[in-house]
Swiss-Prot record:
UniProt name for this protein: Putative pterin-4-alpha-carbinolamine dehydratase
GO molecular function: 4-alpha-hydroxytetrahydrobiopterin dehydratase activity
InterPro entries: PCD_sf, Pterin-4-alpha-carb_dehyd, Pterin_deHydtase
PANTHER family the UniProt entry points to: PTERIN-4-ALPHA-CARBINOLAMINE DEHYDRATASE-RELATED (PTHR42805:SF1)
Recorded superkingdom: Bacteria
Taxonomic source organism: Shewanella denitrificans (strain OS217 / ATCC BAA-1090 / DSM 15013)
EC number(s) recorded for this UniProt protein: 4.2.1.96
Similarity comment: Belongs to the pterin-4-alpha-carbinolamine dehydratase family.
Coiled-coil region: none
Amino acid sequence: MNALTSMKCEACQADAPKVSDQELAELIRLIPDWGVEVRDGIMQLERVYKFKNFKLAMAFTNKLADAAEEEGHHPGILTEWGKVTVTWWSHSIKGLHKNDFIMAAKTDQLLD
């Protein structure tokens, strides 16, 4: 468990600030298995989780859906045979907010 998993997401409005470069450097250290991707100029967090079969991948996807609904923050999810790709970013600000790091940490916690 890290400090992020005990935090709650806050409502993110279009005028909410994106994480600064310094915040990004600090927060990414707390979720070392995640990478930063830039798509269409939008910074996103992404991780691929591996599973033994599709049923386990789907079970993880469903657990993630429940966690996302509970926090009111939703990822991009690609579920395939043996793997799930999860992408977090804040749509309203077209970039990364602290909520994305909180949810990345909570996503990792679902494996426990």
